Amino acid sequence: FVMMTMSAASGKRIAEVLEEKADITAPPEPLDCVEDGSIDFDHVTFSYRQGSGEETLSDIDLHIKSGETIGIIGGTGCGKSSLVSLISRLYDVTSGSVKVGGEDVRGYDLETLRNQVAVVLQKNVLFSGTVLDNLRWGRKMGHMDEYRDACRIACADEFIEHLPKGYDAWVERGGANFSGGQKQRLCIARALLKQPKVLILDDSTSAVDTATDAKIREALQTVIPGTTK
């Protein structure tokens, strides 16, 4: 009886999720190509609660050329993550516009836009399966050399090669059998496999030692100079 009650509650919640309507949708005739990695914030104001008067971002005017590398710093809660979330259109601006590749992000097909804007967060998700299975979320039908190259740039090869089964080593749900730094490096490699025009690293090397962090940043500058970072 207890299991039936729990199953019924779970089924109800699943149905609610399936019936949920997306707040962010593409236009009837969306753009299906991102020309380059240029990013423009034109007088952007953003609030999580529309009409509340509580502005997370106010009148942001920022222009980043394709292939340029910039860093955004600030205290906790100042809106850094909110700012980058607008680039991949996880939220819509309250006023102003965000452009990627010279076009307003609201004009793109969502899958097209998000395939070209790779985001690596401080805490990322690894799935049950092998190391290679997790990398394939970045590129499903890639060659083994491509997976190795991405891991080399992210300095993930340093620990993968020491695993008993290498790229066939098992990853527990959530990457429970890997350290924080190892998970971050795998997620960076996975993002690189998408070959994005924009790569956003949101405190994504916080669990990596200083020397490895420097190696990753140097490799990103050398190997993918055309990607906006």
Language model regions located:
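An intracellular "coupling" helix at the cytosolic face of ABC transporter transmembrane type-1 domains
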Residues: M3-M6, D23, S47-S52
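Cytosolic ends of transmembrane helices, especially the final helix of ABC transmembrane type-1 domains
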Residues: F1-V17
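Pre-NBD coupling/linker segments of ABC/ABC-like ATPases
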Residues: D23-V34
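Conserved E/DxxT/N motif and adjacent residues on the DHp alpha2 helix
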Residues: E16, D23, R136
